[in-house]
Amino acid sequence: MDLGIEVILKLFSKNGLENLFQVASFKFIEFGENSQRIISLQQDYIKTIDSVIAFLQGKNPTLARQICSGNFLPEASRFDQLDDSSENLNWAFGSMGMQDKAKHLATLYLEDLSDFIVECVDENFGFSRYAERLGRSANSFDEMYAHLQSDLTYIDKITLQILEEKLKSINPKLVCISVPFPGNLYSAFRCAQFIKKHFPEIKVSMGGGFPNTELRDLKDKRVFEFFDFITLDDGELPVELLNSNVQIPNSNEFKRTFLIENNEVVYKNNTIRHDYKQAEVGTPDYFDLLLDKYISVIEIANPMHSLWSDGRWNKLTMAHGCYWGKCTFCDISLDYIKVYEPIAARILIDRMEELIAKTGENGFHFVDEAAPPALMREVALEILKRNLTVTWWTNIRFEKNFTADLCILLKASGCIAVSGGLEVASDRLLELIKKGVTVEQVAKVTRNFTESGIMVHAYLMYGYPTQTVQETVDSMEMVRQMFEIGILQSGFWHQFAMTAHSPVGMFPKEFGVVPEMNEITFANNDIQFKDKTGINHDKFSFGLKKSLFNYMHGICFDYDLQDWFDFKIPKTKVSPDFIENSLLEDNSFVVKSSAKIVWIGGKPIVEYFTKSKKGSSWEMAKLTFHDKRQMFDISLEKDKALWLVEILEKNAVQNDKKMTFGQIKEDFEQRFEDFELFWFSKSIEILKENGLLSL
């Protein structure tokens, strides 16, 4: 079950809001002006909430017109950002439409209610996180433990009521709680605490991203007042063995599991069994989740950002771990990064088909650390071969293997977006990070994706160890140019954070930083540090993020970089046409002999005619092609045209075996002369522009 969505749906309902406003009215505190307004409009919120939630669930699409027409949703402070002009909102959503505009307004409406809950009912509330501060690198368990001894909050009571109903209906012997982020930790402990108090016979285990990264040095025995087990890394075998231990108490075989033994915290990894291979783990099962009740929200008017919160995506991975595994800011010492294991494309597409059949949804988010280009190519080919209609996106490295032709193939298979790390946008720092890319290379790759119709989101970083103010300004200019040219559509600046399991965290002296070390008895991931440069990188946050927000909306490119800051910054040293010049190189005549040649178009209509010149005549053939958007034709000598038709058929995307460029060249030269003259002729170039790909 997903307690998160079930709590949200119970809270944001007619009955939920009636109870909420009643509870708030008993609070003897002085409400702020915004909360007073929301209380005054409580009947409007109660009246509209069920309709708005149904709309965000995709069940009430006609409500979009009423929401967009105005005077339907009660408006509090979150709507102040719209006061400039209704034209601004219409312009911002010009590329996204009325449904998305209505989702954005409905999201502001929910955020107003969230602000009210935080001020008047429960200060820890958040839509996707709760009491996040308590879980953020809490080296000691003291604060969390003290919080868990306090009275239940309003949200706690709703959560535990739903949990109790579920436990009574299922009567489980083992409850496994997944904790992906710090914002899920407090609620996980509250649930475990409730189970231990009211259902002491049930065993409780924690797993997921948070313990995998943060709890590897766990020593505090008090944690096991709530949980019987905490497992690390891949969960299939550890959970299977926990189940065996619950069913057969004397089993005593564990995989990467913390537990209490003789009143001490012990880590057990005593099984001789190996983890399941990725090909063996099976397809995710969403059977018990309320798939039709999730809400789709849009926080800001940006098409890429909406992917994270608008709609529900089936989650899969192309490969376990990262095929690069060198970035110095990344947790490359942990198994979820360092153990690289790709999955065969055929198995992946089998899983996609199974999920489509089970969920009725054909949208997929591949949640790889960095999806491998070669595997993405094979996945795309398999999707096209099976004639599937799917929509998918993933995380990548901006590496040179993402050629223009590969991007066209990915788009044809249903890829709509990619996200990747440009990080510091400085070649010196990218080398220090061991990113394996340059700014120029990133520009070329993002151009290839953009021109194929795939949206690009860039993760951006500032404050990396040894980064100078000049480098921060120059990276900002690089980003400005990339947005102005149009090869980036979305981005996000985040400040560098030093983690315990990254090379920077493990070898801080090599990177010129001094860590502030504490005794670790509970969580250990984010490490506070001092950079020997002495630069206060915090002050750049607002200017970087504000400029980026405007660049994403296609405006303010002519502003001086100084305009975004209220303190003096140096002039950029980056040439104003650096990115533009990076894209000038033409590699269209460079094709590897081993490159697969793939035709993703259809069969041509062949017509013959005779051409005459200076008393000579010869037979020609016109090949007419129809694709989804247009018709085009090329004319060739008859024998070469027939050879080409044969080659296109052999290399059609539906076929298992494709000829390489070298094999095609050899085949051509057995019949004709001057292959290069033919292959790089105007007629074949037209085909290349319309689906003849070198991969």
Model-identified regions with their sequence ranges:
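Radical SAM enzyme core and accessory elements
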Residues: 16, 20-25, 33-126, 529-695
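A structural motif corresponding to the C-terminal lobe/cap of the Radical SAM core domain
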Residues: 9-17, 29-36, 40, 44, ...
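Radical SAM [4Fe-4S] cluster-binding motif and immediate context
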Residues: 284-455
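Secondary-structure-rich domain cores
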Residues: 154-226, 342, 346-349, 353-356, ...
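Flexible loop/turn segments at secondary-structure boundaries
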Residues: 6-10, 182-186, 212-214, 239, ...
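Glycine-rich beta-alpha loop elements in corrinoid/cobalamin-binding modules
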Residues: 1-82, 89, 106-109, 132-277
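Active-site cores of enzymes that catalyze phosphoryl transfer or operate on phosphate-rich substrates
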Residues: 112-162, 299, 303-332, 336
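N-terminal [4Fe-4S]-dependent radical SAM core
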Residues: 144, 264-315, 630-633, 689, ...
